[in-house]
């Protein structure tokens, strides 16, 4: 299918799939497709809201499955459609319906990505971009609505029903009717030519060349979904000594903590010191960015631009190295406003309360003193909090604190008021 130069839109109008039979008998083998309606129609069946709670998805969830899309394309918005009916006793409000549209398509095609507007809920997959989508307008006269499906693990809001599944016989019957019409058209020897504008999320026609070409992709998608449900989606990653050494050789503030290179290995023990971090419970310290809560945690982290533009910086001369060259530390501080109107506001507070200063509750781990052959006791030395820092501040006598971690009780006065530090 030819791709227009300009981004295409998915049309959604009143999202009503009750169209007359597009294939009428006696019109030849290749009936002319009906033109697309003026209004836009979603590619997917909608979500019916049966309660007062608004639609909301956790970050990284809420985009319907699409066999023809890439991760970068999986972003868009859900739009609320308020409904009412005139009765003998006046106007009666019906349950609202929500329909999905890709970014840059549908009734809100000109709405910038993640713009705040009543009745609009933005969703995206991790790694998606804010570029307008290439998926075009669906012509309901030629294409049946795709029953909305989500990736395993997606948390569908309470009191929301996916149309076309379960007891929604009306939507299911419409989809079945359109499917029979398409099959009847192909059985007469012709292939239904879609008049939908732009790329379709699915291939058209039963047994068509497009369907056969997409079959391996659909089978692969089915296998991936089955693997996700069975927990076999990822092979265990083996971290070799070479990989660990390479990760450790990175500058401290450029490292990424994972299960194979955990938070303590990457950034040191949690604690109150000026060169220590105080964020992270036992689970986060073990898994790092592989913690299931990481997507919500990452939303609180500023971007590189925000970090450089919102922070108060201070350059401090700490000491000199063996060659006499000065060693500097770049100290920074700042603040992030937590918006109570954000749907993840309560989740953020839960995460912060569970992870800030969580090291104070870590279980104590006693160390057995080493003994020599003559029975003398040798005190064991603790690991440095900053193995990659060549020169360290002058220390006062070491003392034991919670968690049996040997901490520095004193440091350079210039760093006493700094919460986090990074090497310049």
UniProtKB/Swiss-Prot annotation:
Ranges for domain CoV N NTD: 39-164
Role description: Packages the positive strand viral genome RNA into a helical ribonucleocapsid (RNP) and plays a fundamental role during virion assembly through its interactions with the viral genome and membrane protein M. Plays an important role in enhancing the efficiency of subgenomic viral RNA transcription as well as viral replication.
Biased composition (Low complexity): 13-25, 168-200
Subunit annotation: Homooligomer. Both monomeric and oligomeric forms interact with RNA. Interacts with protein M. Interacts with NSP3; this interaction serves to tether the genome to the newly translated replicase-transcriptase complex at a very early stage of infection.
Post-translational modification Phosphothreonine, affected residues: 406
Protein's name in the database: Nucleoprotein
Region (Disordered) location: 1-41, 159-207, 230-251, 365-424
GO molecular function, one term: RNA binding
Source organism per UniProt: Bat coronavirus 133/2005 (BtCoV)
Matches recorded under InterPro entries: N_prot_C_CoV (IPR044344), N_prot_N_CoV (IPR044345), NCAP_bCoV (IPR043505), Nucleocap_CoV (IPR001218), Nucleocapsid_C (IPR037179), Nucleocapsid_N (IPR037195)
Start and end residues of each stretch annotated as RNA-binding: 33-175
Lineage: Viruses, Riboviria, Orthornavirae, Pisuviricota, Pisoniviricetes
Region annotation Dimerization: where it falls in the sequence: 251-360
Post-translational modification Phosphoserine, affected residues: 133
């Amino acid at each position: 299918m030819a791709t227009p130069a300009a981004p295409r839109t998915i049309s959604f109008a009143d999202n009503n799939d009750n169209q007359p039979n597009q294939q009428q008998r006696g019109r030849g083998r290749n009936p002319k497709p009906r033109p697309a309606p003026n209004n836009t129609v979603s590619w997917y069946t909608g979500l019916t809201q049966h309660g007062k709670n608004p639609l909301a998805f956790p970050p990284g969830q809420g985009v319907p499955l699409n066999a023809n899309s890439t991760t970068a394309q999986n972003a868009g918005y859900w739009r609320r459609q308020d409904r009412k009916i005139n009765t003998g006793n006046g106007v009666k409000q019906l349950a609202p319906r929500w329909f999905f549209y890709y970014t840059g398509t549908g009734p809100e095609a000109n709405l910038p990505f993640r713009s705040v507007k009543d009745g609009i809920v933005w969703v995206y997959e991790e790694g998606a971009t804010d570029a307008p989508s290439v998926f075009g307008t669906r012509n309901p006269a030629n294409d049946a609505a795709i029953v909305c499906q989500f990736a395993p693990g997606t948390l569908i809001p309470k009191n929301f029903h996916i149309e076309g599944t379960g007891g929604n016989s009306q939507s299911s019957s419409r989809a079945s009717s359109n499917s029979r019409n398409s099959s009847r058209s192909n059985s007469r020897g012709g292939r239904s030519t879609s008049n939908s504008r732009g790329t379709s999320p699915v291939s058209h026609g039963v047994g068509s060349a497009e369907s056969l070409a997409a079959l391996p992709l659909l089978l692969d998608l089915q296998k991936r979904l089955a693997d996700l449900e069975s927990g076999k989606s990822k092979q265990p990653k083996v971290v070799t000594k070479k990989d660990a050494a390479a990760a450790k050789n990175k500058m401290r503030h450029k490292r990424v903590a994972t299960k194979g290179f955990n938070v303590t290995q990457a950034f040191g023990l949690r604690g109150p010191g000026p060169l220590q971090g105080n964020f992270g419970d036992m689970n986060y310290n073990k898994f790092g960015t592989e913690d299931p809560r990481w997507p919500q945690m990452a939303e609180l982290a500023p971007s590189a631009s925000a970090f450089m533009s919102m922070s108060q910086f201070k350059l401090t001369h700490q000491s000199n190295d063996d060659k006499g060259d000065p060693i500097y530390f770049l100290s920074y501080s700042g603040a992030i406003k937590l918006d109570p109107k954000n749907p993840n506001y309560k989740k953020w507070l839960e995460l912060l309360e569970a992870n800030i200063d969580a090291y104070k509750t870590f279980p104590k781990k006693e160390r057995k003193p080493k003994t020599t052959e003559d029975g003398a006791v040798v005190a064991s030395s603790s690991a440095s909090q900053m193995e990659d820092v060549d020169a360290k501040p002058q220390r006062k006598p070491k003392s034991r604190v919670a968690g049996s971690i040997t901490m520095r009780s004193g440091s350079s006065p210039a760093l006493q008021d700094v919460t986090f530090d990074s090497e310049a």
